[in-house]
Amino acid sequence: MERPAPLAVLPFSDPAHALSLLRGLSQLRAERKFLDVTLEAAGGRDFPAHRAVLAAASPYFRAMFAGQLRESRAERVRLHGVPPDMLQLLLDFSYTGRVAVSGDNAEPLLRAADLLQFPAVKEACGAFLQQQLDLANCLDMQDFAEAFSCSGLASAAQRFILRHVGELGAEQLERLPLARLLRYLRDDGLCVPKEEAAYQLALRWVRADPPRRAAHWPQLLEAVRLPFVRRFYLLAHVEAEPLVARCPPCLRLLREARDFQAARYDRHDRGPCPRMRPRPSTGLAEILVLVGGCDQDCDELVTVDCYNPQTGQWRYLAEFPDHLGGGYSIVALGNDIYVTGGSDGSRLYDCVWRYNSSVNEWTEVAPMLKAREYHSSSVLNGLLYVVAADSTERYDHATDSWEALQPMTYPMDNCSTTACRGRLYAIGSLAGKETMVIQCYDPDTDLWSMVNCGQLPPWSFAPKTVTLNGLMYFVRDDSAEVDVYNPTKDEWDKIPSMNQVHVGGSLAALGGKLYVSGGYDNTFELSDVVEAYDPETRAWSVVGRLPEPTFWHGSVSIFRQFMPQTPAGGRGFELNSGSSDVDAGHHRLPQNPEELQ
């Protein structure tokens, strides 16, 4: 039998070598052999050691011994402010890789590890202290963590405080520095059962020292999400508060909140604003609502589904009570949804249905002045506009009445509409022609005019249109391309294409993003994909799936009550009768801001 040829190279490694080396160095230290430096801790206690071991274990000692300072050659180095027992632990760690962190040594050991640059020991101390957080020490622990740049511990302390803010004592909260209180109020994770509690927290802090703190009240009130404070509380308490009544910036915030609750504030036509985002602990969430459409078999649907992007959950809402037919239009006005017109194939509808999200039911409201189908609807300044080729009318939900307006100057077929910067825009092809145009309606003059915005993109027919952050987005129905128009600058742009086409899909703005759902994809298969576009990252991502593949459905966003998202072990901030105008015994949350009456 032929012997195998000998190997030219035999790779070898000993997995126990590192541990054996550490043991050998530790033994040399115990036997006091080859020691070449002595560290003197606070109090004069000496610790002989090996320079090479210290330099390998700590960037602090590496810089000390490798540089040109006197300590690089000195046989004795004095370490000011390092307790001897902490230096002992760090030296033992250098030679063994082990350290025992306890309640007695965690804080001083973290200080010493931070000073002498032992990051692993510092991290271990921080992890130990995270487990020791409680109501008595959480505020001080956050101060300590931030002072020593211990980010993990600082974040854990903040989460604990936000989660247990309702259990902290009044004295603890009132002694907070302004910057810290603002940080808590601005955080989505502040655990309050309703926004009035956040308002009371800010007010209590100011009232603890009015002469010094009153000047900070506008800044604090801006951090409170006033649009989600109940309407009666806004009128009875916020508006009546002298700190608000005497402050123009505060009155502007109050007016913004009241406009929001009266559906006069279009949050999609503004830039991102934290005040328009409810806190998860209150149970309110901005949701995507899908109405009607057709399924795989082209059967008409009367289902109404809602999607919570925070949890990824779908829920059923009250079904549409009548035959939807086709050619209807869907729009959200405040937190209610309106379905206008349509037909059954032989008869046009003038009926208007309203979905009241606070009670989860559909009711019929005043009919349109004219029956119509394949029209478009939008909301501008709290009023509902319906636009068709030959007529325009406007609905006032406060009076439940319709008003005829000037029709478009140039009739358009199957137009789409959106409100932007105080104007109503209609996009479509001129009646009987293939020419695509944009017309604009001015509510102050009741006049339509042609928009001269240069060469339009090559649309085959009217794209789906929505306004987000003051920009108009146009999603093509026959391709994945998306165009953007800035009416203020009169500029066109193109954003990255969608992941797929959505022929017959639906478009809505929600939470500062665009949501496109359903329709037929690139392979002509009916799709259940929901994808979202984030303007900050300029990227599309698939965020969910429809309950079933659907097309020709409508989608809008509203705020509605979901289960409060309170972290485990947390309790919402509650106001007791001794320090609040709110009845702490009644914490039923409103279904939406319009219930705040």
From Swiss-Prot:
<keyword id="KW-0963">Cytoplasm</keyword>
<dbReference type="InterPro" id="IPR011705">
    <property type="entry name" value="BACK"/>
</dbReference>
<dbReference type="GO" id="GO:0032465">
    <property type="term" value="P:regulation of cytokinesis"/>
</dbReference>
<dbReference type="GO" id="GO:0005737">
    <property type="term" value="C:cytoplasm"/>
</dbReference>
<feature type="repeat" description="Kelch 3">
    <location>
        <begin position="384"/>
        <end position="422"/>
    </location>
</feature>
<feature type="repeat" description="Kelch 6">
    <location>
        <begin position="513"/>
        <end position="560"/>
    </location>
</feature>
<dbReference type="InterPro" id="IPR017096">
    <property type="entry name" value="BTB-kelch_protein"/>
</dbReference>
<feature type="region of interest" description="Disordered">
    <location>
        <begin position="570"/>
        <end position="597"/>
    </location>
</feature>
<dbReference type="InterPro" id="IPR015915">
    <property type="entry name" value="Kelch-typ_b-propeller"/>
</dbReference>
<dbReference type="GO" id="GO:0043161">
    <property type="term" value="P:proteasome-mediated ubiquitin-dependent protein catabolic process"/>
</dbReference>
<dbReference type="GO" id="GO:1990756">
    <property type="term" value="F:ubiquitin-like ligase-substrate adaptor activity"/>
</dbReference>
<dbReference type="GO" id="GO:0035853">
    <property type="term" value="P:chromosome passenger complex localization to spindle midzone"/>
</dbReference>
<dbReference type="GO" id="GO:0016567">
    <property type="term" value="P:protein ubiquitination"/>
</dbReference>
<protein>
    <recommendedName>
        <fullName>Kelch-like protein 21</fullName>
    </recommendedName>
</protein>
<dbReference type="Pfam" id="PF00651">
    <property type="entry name" value="BTB"/>
</dbReference>
<comment type="pathway">
    <text>Protein modification; protein ubiquitination.</text>
</comment>
<feature type="repeat" description="Kelch 5">
    <location>
        <begin position="472"/>
        <end position="512"/>
    </location>
</feature>
<keyword id="KW-0880">Kelch repeat</keyword>
<comment type="function">
    <text>Substrate-specific adapter of BCR (BTB-CUL3-RBX1) E3 ubiquitin-protein ligase complex required for efficient chromosome alignment and cytokinesis. The BCR(KLHL21) E3 ubiquitin ligase complex regulates localization of the chromosomal passenger complex (CPC) from chromosomes to the spindle midzone in anaphase and mediates the ubiquitination of AURKB. Ubiquitination of AURKB by BCR(KLHL21) E3 ubiquitin ligase complex may not lead to its degradation by the proteasome.</text>
</comment>
<feature type="domain" description="BACK">
    <location>
        <begin position="138"/>
        <end position="239"/>
    </location>
</feature>
<dbReference type="GO" id="GO:0005827">
    <property type="term" value="C:polar microtubule"/>
</dbReference>
<keyword id="KW-0132">Cell division</keyword>
<dbReference type="GO" id="GO:0051301">
    <property type="term" value="P:cell division"/>
</dbReference>
<feature type="repeat" description="Kelch 4">
    <location>
        <begin position="423"/>
        <end position="470"/>
    </location>
</feature>
<keyword id="KW-0131">Cell cycle</keyword>
<feature type="repeat" description="Kelch 1">
    <location>
        <begin position="287"/>
        <end position="335"/>
    </location>
</feature>
<dbReference type="InterPro" id="IPR000210">
    <property type="entry name" value="BTB/POZ_dom"/>
</dbReference>
<dbReference type="InterPro" id="IPR047069">
    <property type="entry name" value="KLHL21_BACK"/>
</dbReference>
<keyword id="KW-0833">Ubl conjugation pathway</keyword>
<dbReference type="InterPro" id="IPR011333">
    <property type="entry name" value="SKP1/BTB/POZ_sf"/>
</dbReference>
<dbReference type="InterPro" id="IPR006652">
    <property type="entry name" value="Kelch_1"/>
</dbReference>
<dbReference type="GO" id="GO:0004842">
    <property type="term" value="F:ubiquitin-protein transferase activity"/>
</dbReference>
<feature type="repeat" description="Kelch 2">
    <location>
        <begin position="336"/>
        <end position="382"/>
    </location>
</feature>
<comment type="subunit">
    <text>Component of the BCR(KLHL21) E3 ubiquitin ligase complex, at least composed of CUL3, KLHL21 and RBX1.</text>
</comment>
<keyword id="KW-0206">Cytoskeleton</keyword>
<feature type="domain" description="BTB">
    <location>
        <begin position="35"/>
        <end position="103"/>
    </location>
</feature>
<dbReference type="Pfam" id="PF07707">
    <property type="entry name" value="BACK"/>
</dbReference>
<dbReference type="GO" id="GO:0031463">
    <property type="term" value="C:Cul3-RING ubiquitin ligase complex"/>
</dbReference>
<keyword id="KW-0677">Repeat</keyword>
<dbReference type="Pfam" id="PF13964">
    <property type="entry name" value="Kelch_6"/>
</dbReference>
<dbReference type="InterPro" id="IPR030577">
    <property type="entry name" value="BTB/POZ_KLHL21"/>
</dbReference>
<dbReference type="GO" id="GO:0097602">
    <property type="term" value="F:cullin family protein binding"/>
</dbReference>
